[in-house]
């Protein structure tokens, strides 16, 4: 879990828009972020395997 201060800091609008960065909606992680889903790779994997994300199916061939 990310520090609460960093999560709050990322939610504020920065002085310069170049400084803005994404964080996971669930855990607040900043790295490994999937823009399309708004989740980090860990939360994405957990929710995809649980079937919480519609349209995502585990690949098998």
UniProtKB/Swiss-Prot annotation:
May I ask which residue range the UniProt record assigns to the signal sequence?
A: none
InterPro entries referenced in this protein's UniProt entry, alphabetically: Ribosomal_uS14, Ribosomal_uS14_bact, Ribosomal_uS14_CS, Ribosomal_uS14_sf
Cofactor (UniProt): Zn(2+)
Q: Which GO terms describe its molecular function?
A: rRNA binding; structural constituent of ribosome; zinc ion binding
So which domain of life are we looking at?
Answer: Bacteria
Q: Any binding details for the cofactor?
A: Binds 1 zinc ion per subunit.
List, alphabetically, the GO terms of the cellular component aspect.
cytoplasm; small ribosomal subunit
State the UniProt keywords alphabetically: Metal-binding, Ribonucleoprotein, Ribosomal protein, RNA-binding, rRNA-binding, Zinc
Q: Tell me the Gene Ontology biological-process terms attached to this UniProt entry.
A: translation
- Pfam families (alphabetical): Ribosomal_S14 (PF00253)
> What Gene3D superfamilies does its record include?
30s Ribosomal Protein S14, Chain N
Query: How does the record describe its quaternary structure?
Result: Part of the 30S ribosomal subunit. Contacts proteins S3 and S10.
Q: Which family does it belong to?
A: Belongs to the universal ribosomal protein uS14 family. Zinc-binding uS14 subfamily.
What this protein is reported to do is described as: Binds 16S rRNA, required for the assembly of 30S particles and may also be responsible for determining the conformation of the 16S rRNA at the A site.
Annotated protein name in UniProt? Small ribosomal subunit protein uS14
- Organism in which the protein naturally occurs: Acidithiobacillus ferrooxidans (strain ATCC 23270 / DSM 14882 / CIP 104768 / NCIMB 8455)
């Amino acid at each position: 879990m990310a520090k609460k201060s960093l999560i709050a800091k990322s939610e504020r609008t920065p002085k310069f828009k170049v400084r803005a960065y994404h964080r996971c909606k669930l855990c607040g992680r900043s790295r490994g972020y999937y823009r399309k889903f708004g989740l980090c790779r860990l939360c994405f994997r957990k929710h995809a395997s649980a079937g919480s994300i519609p349209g995502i199916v585990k690949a098998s061939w």
